Regions:
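N-terminal (or domain-start) structured segment
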Residues: 28-97, 105
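Extracytoplasmic
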Residues: 30, 59-61, 71-74, 81, ...
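Pocket-lining segment of extracytoplasmic ligand-binding domains
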Residues: 91-93, 101-103, 131, 167-267
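An extracytoplasmic/periplasmic, membrane-proximal ligand-sensing/linker region
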Residues: 181, 188, 198-216, 226-232, ...
């Protein structure tokens, strides 16, 4: 009888202690959230890496990672199949994916939601030295790289070629490659011209220009107007002289917006915290009294210091070009801001 009475309080103590120590353990359980970006030679990957690190430091119990990949179209398909939580995509590709048009004909990505527009992506037409390409009238008969097959860059290439009255049949050869692959082919003189849609300066072009002379092929005003009339999600832009070595003149081009999109199944509170951490100073992490956690820079501010295109990531333009539904978590944040 004595042993039984002694045993019961002991068991109760063990249970109580297990509950005490299990509570914090459960509370500290971390979740994972990924951002699908693009190839290492583009802008998505470095900016995605900076954003992932910045937000991981601002939001407790979540590990955010950036994954390299095949960019816009592929990222939409990864979200559709719930293989990844979020990704960077062009706004025109996001529109096509959600509505099941263009390259997504009959295969809509209805679980695609927007968090924010980030920065302009410029359609850069890069020609190698000696290719005989100074303007768009020189493109016909050349060896073309329109981007990866099925990529957002290829979509942009086809739009530009349409505006110029050209198709793939007008070229001597067409190869589908990543930005890095395109840069190598141009360097090796195995291709004449490549389309690269990314925020400038783009790593693949910068690297190419350090070892080879290049030309940024300008679009004429008539072609730009024709393309924008047909595809109103594009806008006219100028790539400043000096963006790349040896390119000492301004280059007229067209641009679209890079957007951060997310799976609709991601919880509202998670996306709210991500959106708030992107735009607001401070942190969700509990700090010791007297520290400067409230002054911690926003994700956008950190991106601005890390990359030239990061300076274009602003709350003012967060909803520019958004043509798909906002995720409820993002919508909650923008409503609080009166947007």
């Amino acid at each position: 009888m004595f042993e039984k009475k002694k045993f019961i309080p002991f068991v109760a103590l063990i249970i109580a202690l297990s509950m005490i120590f299990a509570g914090p353990a459960c509370a500290q359980q971390k979740s994972f959230f990924a951002i699908a970006t693009g190839g290492t030679g583009g802008t998505y990957y470095p900016l995605g890496g900076v954003l992932a690190q910045a937000l991981s430091n601002k939001i407790p119990n979540i590990i955010i990672t950036a994954q390299s990949g095949n960019a816009s179209v592929a990222n939409c398909n990864l979200i559709k199949s719930h293989q990844i939580e979020s990704g960077f995509v062009q706004n025109n590709v996001a529109y096509a994916a959600y509505n099941g048009v263009a390259q997504f004909e009959g295969k809509p990505v209805k679980n695609l939601r927007a968090i924010a527009s980030l920065y302009p992506e410029t359609i850069q037409i890069v020609a190698r030295e000696g290719a005989g390409i100074k303007s768009v009238v020189d493109l016909k008969g050349k060896k073309l790289i329109p981007g990866d097959r099925g990529s957002g860059t290829e979509v942009d290439c086809k739009a530009v070629l349409w505006g110029l009255g050209l198709t793939y049949d007008d070229f001597a050869n067409v190869d589908w490659l990543s930005f890095a692959g395109a840069g190598q082919r141009l360097k090796d003189r195995q291709a004449d011209v490549a389309f690269i849609t990314a925020g400038w300066p783009t790593a693949a072009i910068t690297e190419l220009a350090t070892t080879s002379d290049i030309t940024l092929v300008p679009l004429d005003d008539e072609s730009i107007a024709k393309i924008i009339k047909q595809y109103p999600f594009y806008a006219k832009v100028t790539i400043p002289a000096g963006t790349y070595r040896g390119v000492d003149v301004d280059t007229p081009a067209i641009t679209t917006m890079a957007q951060w999109v997310v799976d609709a199944d991601v919880p509202e509170e998670t996306v709210y915290k991500l959106t708030k951490a992107l735009w607001d100073k401070g942190t969700f992490v509990l700090r010791k009294k007297g520290d400067k956690a409230a002054e911690a820079p926003s994700g956008a501010e950190i991106m601005a210091k890390a990359h030239a295109k990061g300076k274009d990531v602003t709350l003012k333009t967060a909803l520019d070009g958004v043509a798909i539904p906002l995720h409820p978590g993002a919508a909650k944040f923008y409503k609080e801001k009166g947007m």
